[in-house]
UniProtKB/Swiss-Prot annotation:
It holds the Pfam family PBP_GOBP. Glycans are attached at N23. The keyword Acyltransferase does not apply. The gene is Obp56a. This is General odorant-binding protein 56a. It is found in: Secreted. Changing V88M: In strain: 301A, 306A, 313A, 315A, 318A, 322A, 324A, 332A, 357A, 390A, 399A, 732A, 735A, 736A, 737A, 797A, 799A, 808A, 820A, 822A, 838A and 868A. GO terms for molecular function: odorant binding. The keyword Secreted applies. It comes from Drosophila melanogaster. Disulfide bonds join C39-C71, C67-C118, C109-C127.
């Protein structure tokens, strides 16, 4: 698996599913930003939708925001044609949050299907979000 893919997948789960309590390299942050910008353009997010995505506000997502999530997940390989790529998730997310927590997330989330691939991506985001690490306490 090439380093581009590893970085992309790591950035995906941190920015969309895991939250910001993990540290990303500058390269990972840049790659995630590139994917966000490309997907925003591809699905033609409105300025209001872009603001929601940037604020990580995925409550009551529009169809465009759901398709943005699908685009992002597909760019990094965790979804392919609406199907979760479990081996990829286990290998890469496991390195970030631990194998056991990743297996628990997959057990809960693997059967999720939406009305279409965009809806599936949005529902998977919601499912994986429940496994994100608690924020670290500030001293």
């Amino acid at each position: 698996m090439n380093s581009y893919f590893v970085i992309a997948l790591s950035a995906l789960f941190v920015t969309l599913a895991v939250g910001s309590s993990l540290n990303l390299s500058d390269e990972q942050k840049d790659l995630a930003k590139q994917h966000r910008e490309q997907c925003a353009e591809e699905v033609k997010l409105t300025e209001e939708e872009k603001a929601k995505v940037n604020a990580k506000d995925f409550n009551n997502p529009t169809e465009n925001i759901k398709c943005f999530a699908n685009c992002f997940f597909e760019k990094v390989g965790t979804l392919k044609d609406g199907e979760l790529q479990e081996s990829v998730v286990l290998e890469k997310l496991g390195a970030l949050i631990g194998e056991e927590k990743t297996k628990a997330a997959l057990e809960k989330c693997r059967t999720i299907k939406g009305e279409n691939k965009c809806d599936t991506a949005s529902k998977l985001y919601d499912c994986f979000e429940s496994f994100k690490p608690a924020p670290e306490a500030k001293a």
